[in-house]
Amino acid sequence: MRVLYIHAERFSWESREPALDIRDEPGSGAAANALVVFVSVERGDSSDEEFLRRVARDVVETAEKVKATAVVIYPYAHLSNDLARPYVAKEVVNKLYEVVKSEFKGEVYKAPFGYYKAFEVKCLGHPLAELSRSFKPEEARVAKAVEERRDVYLVLTPDGREHDPAAYSPADPDLKALIDKEVFKRELGGGEPRYLDYLRKFGFEWEPMSDVGHMRYGPEATVMMELVEDYAYQVAKSLGIPVFKIRGTNMFKLSEKAIETHARLFGERLYIVESDTDLILRYAACFQQFAMAKDWVISYRNLPFGMLEIADSYRHEQPGETVVLFRLRRFYMPDLHIFTKDLAEAVEVSYKVHEAIFREIGKLGRTYVSLYNVTEEFYKSHRDYLVELARREGKPILVRILPTQKYYWVLNVEYHIVDELGRPREIATFQIDVGNAQRFGIKYVDENNQVKYPVIIHTAIIGSVERYLYAVFDTIAKAEREGKTPRLPTWLAPVQVRIIPVARDNLKFAMEVADKLEEAGIRVDVDDRDETLSKRIRDAETSWVPYVCVVGSKEEETGTLSVRIRGEGQAKMTAEELIKRVREETRGYPTRPLYLPRLLSQRPTRG
């Protein structure tokens, strides 16, 4: 923060026209014998109380030293080339004004933020009449860190007992890994994960012509992404409540109070876009769904209900922390918000969400260890609720108790798998939000015709689209470490069946079989390339195609296919039997068509 002090015999100001979308109400004023405090808020400054009290003490001491009877806080953007974002600067200036007002015995004024202003000043011209200052928040943060109450961690077992993580010896190695990472901040696992090799064959890769942390998705990756998106909607509907699927924008104005406040509560990693106004790229679907829900007329009879969007989401992760398919600056979130009457109903609905989260990861052959982030007040009043969730998990949970409510939630449950390298990796989540309905103006009318604000559950039951696929590939990596053949779930395989004609004469029959399979909703292609049979079979294996059918004259005559089943061996079956088998393996999952030309000869090869 840069500050210029002017001890003025007279000082007056008047707002003329708006300079920013984020601004105070217009105004004017005047003061005599005033210390005028021209303030430029810089990047890195914050509304941290200790920092602002340090600045305020200097303001008050200077005012008393020059015997000023008034102080004027004047937002002034021309003292620095490294200014904070307007929404940050406005908050810092306004809070500085409040702190100075509480500590200075004379009059304290503030010129409006966000305007072109006219001012007149008559400087008194003594040795202390013009002074400059520079303040850095780091010094205040160090002092505050000593005094600030730290988060408390404990292990809560299904029988309701609490344990100190330092003295607790978990039987579950996954829980131990979570405790080591979260409580003791130990670096876990090392080496190159296998899943990175898998991703290249399916077209999941960084986009070098974009910002750090942005991916591109080839045809195989795209069909897998869209299948997971479809499945996320299917899972949301399985909760047994009405779910409204929507679409919206990814940019929101920071000048909107609700957006600005929610962004501050989210914390760091905001993705800001500079335009003719400051815009924030959404970090989940919250902004759009809440902006839409506030315009709905909602009755208690409508609750609970959900809103789902597959939201392109943006988080400004550090460049060295981005990991393909896991930690990204841009990703796709099947973000479900469930609107409930009150906290009691939110608790009841959360049991369904919790059950669905474990059910879905169980379908991949995995389970979660859970971290429960909770405010101290909520833990004291709802401890039995957390014990019940632990009981439903059937194992101990790690609880982090925050002394104050720093975020928009009172409970945030993170569900972690432990990957092939022994590292906890958060996939799914749910949160209970008691403030955003009022912040955005989302209301409902209860049975007594009273206007109420719903309690909102935020959840990504299967995680982001990318993280769900990360869990799939990590599961395959673990299986391969155990000596098993790597294999995608059949419903997710970009190509479910490949037909390889032995000779050119067999191509017509191969296409007829492919037609039959395609009509049954199976993604099928035909390898008609002028390559040897062994190479084409090898390429199908490299591509992890679950079913590879080699058709020659014998198969044409008998109508029986020679099928290589990935990870199992060879079998003879008719096209109808193959269709039945694929349908059994994909029952309950969405389908999509092939996103590639059927004939491999028509496809460009990767460089």
Curated annotation (Swiss-Prot):
Domain of life of the native organism: Archaea
Q: Which GO terms describe its molecular function?
A: ATP binding; threonine-tRNA ligase activity; tRNA binding; zinc ion binding
Kindly give the PROSITE patterns that the UniProt entry links to this protein.
Answer: AA_TRNA_LIGASE_II
Presence of the UniProt keyword Aminoacyl-tRNA synthetase in the record: yes
In this chain, the stretch annotated as Editing domain covers 1-143
Q: Which reaction does it catalyse?
A: tRNA(Thr) + L-threonine + ATP = L-threonyl-tRNA(Thr) + AMP + diphosphate + H(+)
Where is Zn(2+) annotated to bind? 286, 337, 458
Primary location group: cytoplasm
Per its UniProt record, the required cofactor names are: Zn(2+)
Free-text remark on how the cofactor is bound: Binds 1 zinc ion per subunit.
Q: Which GO terms describe its biological process?
A: threonyl-tRNA aminoacylation
Name of the protein in its database record: Threonine--tRNA ligase
Q: Which organism is it from?
A: Pyrobaculum calidifontis (strain DSM 21063 / JCM 11548 / VA1)
| Gene label | thrS
